[in-house]
Amino acid sequence: MLSPKRTKFRRHHRGRMKGISSRGNFIAFGKFALQALEPSWITSRQIEAGRRAMTRYARRGGKIWIRIFPDKPVTMRAAETRMGSGKGSPEFWVAVVKPGRILYEMSGVSESIAKSAMRIAAFKMPIKTQFLVKKDKV
């Protein structure tokens, strides 16, 4: 699963996801892509589940790029802990995703295989997504 090797600070504020994604919102590497349509936190486990589903379906053909990285730690307190005594310890990592962000890219396979693979990966995501095809420059 994905997580940063080291970070400047151990704990982050929760923040808020307002607006649309201004970065990572166009196809850069592959020919097909899965794009987010809703804002959400996507955990490293969900990213890995989507990647596994796509690689299993595409088999040897095709290359996959993961365009999001979980760099935000989410902290949790132990159950039945009293208030106070500081913030909880980091439990898992999430990627903050806004609408328009490209989650995965794929190339080297036919459109039908890519669409089916992305559809399986989309079921692993906690948000609505759409399938994109890169337009050829004339």
Swiss-Prot record:
Its main location: plastid. One of its GO terms (biological process) is mitochondrial translation. It holds the Pfam family Ribosomal_L16. GO terms for cellular component: chloroplast; mitochondrial large ribosomal subunit. The keyword Plastid applies. Keywords: Chloroplast, Plastid, Ribonucleoprotein, Ribosomal protein. The keyword DNA-binding does not apply. It is found in: Plastid, Chloroplast. GO terms for molecular function: rRNA binding; structural constituent of ribosome. Gene3D superfamilies: Ribosomal protein L10e/L16. Signal peptide: none annotated. It comes from the Eukaryota. Part of the 50S ribosomal subunit. Belongs to the universal ribosomal protein uL16 family. This is Large ribosomal subunit protein uL16c. It comes from Chaetosphaeridium globosum (Charophycean green alga).
